[in-house]
From Swiss-Prot:
It is found in: Cytoplasm. Its EC number is 3.1.1.96. GO terms for molecular function: D-tyrosyl-tRNA(Tyr) deacylase activity; Gly-tRNA(Ala) deacylase activity; Ser(Gly)-tRNA(Ala) hydrolase activity; tRNA binding. This is D-aminoacyl-tRNA deacylase. The keyword GTP-binding does not apply. The keyword Hydrolase applies. One of its GO terms (cellular component) is cytoplasm. It comes from Clostridium perfringens (strain 13 / Type A). Pfam families: Tyr_Deacylase. It catalyses: glycyl-tRNA(Ala) + H2O = tRNA(Ala) + glycine + H(+); a D-aminoacyl-tRNA + H2O = a tRNA + a D-alpha-amino acid + H(+).
Amino acid sequence: MRVVVQRVNKSSVKVDNEIVGSINKGFNVLVGIGKEDTIEDLKYMKDKVLNLRVFEDEEDKMNLSLKDVCGELLLISQFTLYGDCRKGRRPNFMNALGGDEAKKLFDEFVSMCREEGIKVETGVFGAHMVVDIENDGPVTLILDSKKNF
């Protein structure tokens, strides 16, 4: 499982020019599900994302987590995080999990985050989306549940 986490002041996602999800202070998270991902990958990523200490404390030190600041999550499915561009000029997406299976795991990840008491909004799985992000920092992190980077 791969995610790109962006600390935001606000973020929203539109499908067919309609806002389908929006948050205030928190994380905009692009979520890619790989062929080898399991529930254990989802649990690892949920714990990692919700507990990343990248919000400033009273001394302006990155010391607080999303949970600490009562932040919100906008989760957006993005299979292109598994794009392999090492050969040629067109990305190869062979390591991304296919549609129905990926949707099940994405939905499970959303549920797991909501169970933690976090406000969670989402895009629409498989849809063409327009994402509006007001970055804070900017702070952007790339995480991989297999710890490849």
